[in-house]
Amino acid sequence: MSGSTFGRVFRLTTYGESHGAGLGGVVDGCPAGIALTEAMIQAELDRRRPGQGGPAATARKEPDRVRLLSGVFEGRTTGTPVAFHVENTDQRSRDYGDIMHVYRPGHADVTYDAKYGRRDYRGGGRSSGRETLSRVAGGAVAQALLAECGITVNAFTVELGGVPARPEDPAGAQDRPFFAPEEDIVAQWDALVRNVKGRGDTVGGIVQVEAYGVPAGLGEPVFDRLDARLACALMSVGAVKGVEIGAGFAAARLTGSSNNDAMTARGYAGNNAGGILGGISSGQTVVARAAVKPIPSVAQEQHTVDDSGREVILRVGGRHDISAIPRIVPVLKAMTALTLADMLLMQRRMTAVRA
């Protein structure tokens, strides 16, 4: 399988499956001298850990304790590859015995079979959402690099199950259920998820990511535009079905004069561009949103086929999230950080040559 490495200069390669021995990754290209500890990575992993997130979360309990294997000495990176590993401890593969030969609707079962001629039916293997653990750990390394440059990334939920939130306090979202950007919406989202769970169904939502302190000049036109790379990063997450930057699809309904961000001596008067112009960061806050589909594992009867082409009725068992939100929020934050870290180092190379 190819496609397990992300980045050009700051590169993350990941490994592992949902029901394998463990997951992990290697970050190559991280400069020396960056403050980094296991605790810093663990803090990010704890935000996406299974068994939390209230009624939306899976019943699978994983401690997700990370071990740094290389690349760090006395609390700082050495410039060599940063390797990390997390053990799987709560696999329950017996839950999947009845779907050994059955394709689950909405999952990658049928496409993995078409591509490889075989698949790991236990929780989806590499296509499972558990794969994102390695992204979050790698993203923590990227965030450590960005922090040294005054760049921070935040992510929060702006809509769940069709119910929007008012982004009144995005900074406080990290301490609220569902990573909600306002307090009042939490009870409403909680009731919605419980209702959907009671019906044996699932819901999706929309997550917003913001990056602050991004300097002007990041991005490599034409095919490595910052917005193109960011969209690629977010779309690479399995549950994401759409990405918009800044005003996004709403810009299609505006006039040019309304969509343009006027410039003044004090800076930009708006941010419809989402902090990116011509594929290059403008110095404003970088803003992106990702549409997250409902989890395809629903506790209802569904029509499908098995690997011999026979029609069957399937009711998915096992332990599953009711929504990818809130656990996908740290994943999208991580992918944004990885993109910015890579672009930052690409820009440093260019300016070094120019100097």
From Swiss-Prot:
Pathway: Metabolic intermediate biosynthesis; chorismate biosynthesis; chorismate from D-erythrose 4-phosphate and phosphoenolpyruvate: step 7/7. FMN binds at residues 126-128, 278, 293-297, 319. It comes from Oleidesulfovibrio alaskensis (strain ATCC BAA-1058 / DSM 17464 / G20) (Desulfovibrio alaskensis). Belongs to the chorismate synthase family. The gene is aroC. GO terms for cellular component: cytosol. GO terms for biological process: amino acid biosynthetic process; aromatic amino acid family biosynthetic process; chorismate biosynthetic process. PANTHER family: CHORISMATE SYNTHASE. It catalyses: 5-O-(1-carboxyvinyl)-3-phosphoshikimate = chorismate + phosphate. NADP(+) binds at residue 48. Reduced FMN (FMNH(2)). This reaction introduces a second double bond into the aromatic ring system. It comes from the Bacteria. Keywords: Amino-acid biosynthesis, Aromatic amino acid biosynthesis, FAD, Flavoprotein, FMN, Lyase, NADP. GO terms for molecular function: chorismate synthase activity; FMN binding. This is Chorismate synthase. PROSITE patterns: CHORISMATE_SYNTHASE_1 (PS00787), CHORISMATE_SYNTHASE_2 (PS00788).
